[in-house]
Amino acid sequence: MESIIEIKDLSFRFQADQEHYDVHNITFHVKRGEWLSIVGHNGSGKSTTVRLIDGLLEAESGEIWIDGDCLTPENVWEKRRKIGMVFQNPDNQFVGATVEDDVAFGLENQGIPLEEMEVRVTEALSLVGMAEFSKKEPARLSGGQKQRVAIAGVVALRPDILILDEATSMLDPEGRLELIKIVQKIRQNHHMTVISITHDLDEVAMSDRVLVMKKGEVESTSAPRELFSRSDLDQIGLDQPFVNQLKQSLRDNGLKLPEHYLTEEELEEALWELF
């Protein structure tokens, strides 16, 4: 599978005279159509990295390749059209008086004809389950509903890449899971590439690969299953999955269970075999 994003020896610091780099000499790629989660403690460089990819920040050194072209000041606006970004706080993203106005805002800026705009707004709101709220004021929505509208606004623009910068962190567990499932559906229906910065285990589990950042550098990349087998998850800003905690408790009480990570279904099967 070809890469839609390639990062090569990328470095950045917010102040030219500061000693440490916020992002230092990182190299990684994102395959077209995959879901890549980026995890790590606060201050590890996650958000800075995606802002460099989106052209919101300019790298001090290194290269960013998007869909076969190296990102430059001359093509940054063109490449930014390929990327949609949803941030942590949806209230900071609303500009329209109604839900449908807000989703239409980006389309108006791109000069999309009115008829096509109406179709795209309707499709995007239906996709995130918010069509019945199209005439509502955004301020009257719940946190989860606001994030759905924010995602609809991005989807309506039909980008190739969707970046979620801790977009589920302010939601309750049920709201987070609903939003993750919506993103997965969008990804499958539109063949979209997803990059998510997250501390949420369900979000990580949904991804194809996980990139771990530590002190501005790439510490490792792995499949979620391999990541969850690590004993030092707390050192990279993640909790142990509940199934890991349960399995360890059972092992401590004498049950012979595998050391490697098991899904809930696999743990259930292992317990049935023991009894």
Q: Where do the protein language model's features map onto the residues?
A:
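Helix-to-loop junction immediately C-terminal to a conserved catalytic motif
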Residues: 54
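Conserved ABC transporter NBD signature motif
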Residues: 62-70, 79
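Conserved ABC ATPase "signature" region
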Residues: 115-133
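Conserved ABC ATPase signature
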Residues: 137-141, 145
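Catalytic Walker B motif of ABC-type/P-loop ATPase nucleotide-binding domains
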Residues: 162-165
